[in-house]
């Protein structure tokens, strides 16, 4: 029986830097314009889908080159590997639910958990279309203003997990880990939201009165999840806001 499920964002959550921001800042229209574009997303005058597309369309570097650059530059949260290994030992599924691009996520995540373990992590994300000249564009997962409505993806998984419950069995505890605006819809689908300290998601949660628990690294997340599953603390006790 599955006692808990970890849903997590990827960029800026599993990674210490956001791969899409890095590509935009160094190969696209730069950090200043990116921040300007996302002001509109934060104040709801522009959809995440539109803002993200503007960022990516400013990058003209061939896709394989982008991957090589990211492999050298993007660091991964060292606590994630311990969390993943604990999850494997305790039959806790780990599902990456991302507004980024699957090929990038798969390459970077393989570097962290290893080729033999990557198939144990589900990745639900946008795809990439690459032409004969290695030019590329994002293919959004759905038609929503997010490009990928994470709440829909999470809801589908919840239905799958709960459909196998036997009489009297409790449903799993759903955890979500994130850092940005695109994580808000996902957060509302889960029992406990871990929001990265100092990032947009914390600001947004305070503005929208969404309960959350702040974290710095996955070491904090792992410690809190262990407390909940051991019955030492309730989800409500860990919530802030």
Curated annotation (Swiss-Prot):
In its UniProt record, which GO terms are filed under biological process?
Answer: alditol phosphate metabolic process; L-serine biosynthetic process
Required cofactor names: Mg(2+)
Q: CDD domains annotated for this entry?
A: HAD_Pase
Q: What happens when the gene is disrupted?
A: Impairs the ability to metabolize cellular polyol phosphates which may build up to toxic levels in cells.
| Annotated Mg(2+) binding sites | 9, 11, 179
Q: Which catalytic reaction applies to this protein? A: D-ribitol 5-phosphate + H2O = ribitol + phosphate; D-sorbitol 6-phosphate + H2O = D-sorbitol + phosphate; sn-glycerol 1-phosphate + H2O = glycerol + phosphate; D-erythrose 4-phosphate + H2O = D-erythrose + phosphate
InterPro entries annotated for this entry?
HAD-like_hydrolase_phosphatase, HAD-like_sf, HAD_hydro_PyrdxlP_Pase-like, HAD_sf
Query: What are the protein's UniProt keywords?
Result: Cytoplasm, Hydrolase, Magnesium, Metal-binding, Nucleus
GO molecular function annotation: glycerol-1-phosphatase activity; glycerol-3-phosphatase activity; L-phosphoserine phosphatase activity; magnesium ion binding; ribitol-5-phosphatase activity; sorbitol-6-phosphatase activity
Highest taxon in the source lineage? Eukaryota
- Catalytic residues, chain numbering: 9 (nucleophile), 11 (proton donor)
Q: Where does it localize?
A: Cytoplasm; Nucleus
Gene Ontology cellular-component annotations = cytoplasm; nucleus
Task: Specify the enzyme's EC class, one word.
Answer: hydrolase
Q: What is its EC number?
A: 3.1.3.50
The main place the protein resides is: cytoplasm
Q: Which Pfam families does the protein's record reference?
A: HAD (PF12710)
Q: Which family does it belong to?
A: Belongs to the HAD-like hydrolase superfamily.
**Further comment found in the protein's record:** Present with 12600 molecules/cell in log phase SD medium.
Q: Give the protein's function.
A: Hydrolyzes sugar alcohol (polyol) phosphates. Dephosphorylates a variety of substrates, including: sn-glycerol 1-phosphate (D-glycerol 3-phosphate), D-ribitol 5-phosphate, D-sorbitol 6-phosphate (D-glucitol 6-phosphate), and D-erythrose 4-phosphate. Prevents accumulation of toxic levels of polyol phosphates, which can impair glycolysis by inhibiting glucose-6-phosphate isomerase.
Q: What is the protein's given name?
A: Polyol phosphate phosphatase PYP1
